[in-house]
Regions:
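Active-site loop-to-helix "anion-binding N-cap" substructures in soluble metabolic enzymes
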Residues: 1-244
Length: 244
């Protein structure tokens, strides 16, 4: 089995019911040849699924709790995401790690809950700028992989997103050799346990750099923030992946 190609959009805390019109354009304009996923704020999940109708577009959550249900005000269980129509959930995004103090162990527990609910967990890893400058990128990422991936992970229920923290929302990206180096290390580290796992790159992916990034070995897709909010920005990225 070859890794599946996935173009994933992360709307973060952006969008409202009016923004769902973008979904019509994505469903109408998307090419086959890769999976396409949009992860909106949780309140938009169900209306987005309704809007997609029979269209070939996946939706996902941006986080879930590690428990199945209970007294956790403001949190969302993985089964509730699945019930709303989600197929995937992003876990351990650097914004969750920074804003909410999520540790690798938290991410692993959430991923276990996601798998129990039948969701595909997109587990995010990535170094800060200080870590890159200190030359510790590969060690940092190896440790995040080791700590954030639960034993129940398989190539089918897990996706790994390499997202250098300093490239997110900044317009800066690593050079191709830097992306290739990290993706090769991740592929190698997971070769025994998750041999066909999809490896996404994330951080300032846009139409102008997508083709170049998708040509890099072991890049099976992208996790896209800002450029996923508008169909006109996102569709060229989807096309570039489908053509890669
Ligand atoms: P960006 O965000 O594409 O806006 O840099 C990527 C991400 O955080 O997943």
């Amino acid at each position: 089995m070859a890794p599946r190609k996935l173009a994933a959009g992360n709307w973060k805390m952006n969008g409202d019911l009016a923004a769902l019109s973008q979904i019509d354009a994505i469903v109408a304009g998307r090419e086959t040849g890769c999976d396409v996923l949009i992860c909106p704020p949780a309140v938009l999940l169900h209306p987005m699924v309704a809007r997609i109708g029979g269209g070939d577009l996946l939706v996902g959550g941006q986080d879930c709790h590690h428990a199945g249900s209970g007294a956790h005000t403001g949190d969302i269980a993985a089964a509730q995401l699945a019930d709303a129509g989600a197929s995937h959930v992003i876990l351990g995004h650097s914004e969750r790690r920074a804003d909410h103090g999520e540790t690798d162990a938290d991410v692993a527990a959430k991923a276990r809950a996601a798998h129990d609910a039948g969701l595909i967990a997109i587990i995010c890893v990535g170094e800060t700028e200080a870590e890159r400058d200190a030359g510790t990128t590969l060690d940092v990422i190896a440790a995040q992989l080791q700590g954030s991936i639960p034993d129940c992970a398989t190539s089918a229920n897990t996706v790994i997103a390499y997202e250098p923290v300093w490239a997110i929302g900044t317009g800066r990206t690593p050079d191709n050799a830097q992306i290739a180096e990290v993706h090769a290390m991740i592929r190698d580290a997971l070769s025994a346990t998750l041999p066909d796992v999809s490896l996404l790159y994330g951080g300032s992916v846009k139409a102008a750099n997508a083709t170049e990034i998708f040509a890099i070995d072991n890049v099976d897709g992208a996790l896209v923030g800002g450029a996923s909010l508008k169909a006109a920005d996102f569709l060229p990225i989807v096309s570039a992946l489908a053509a890669s």
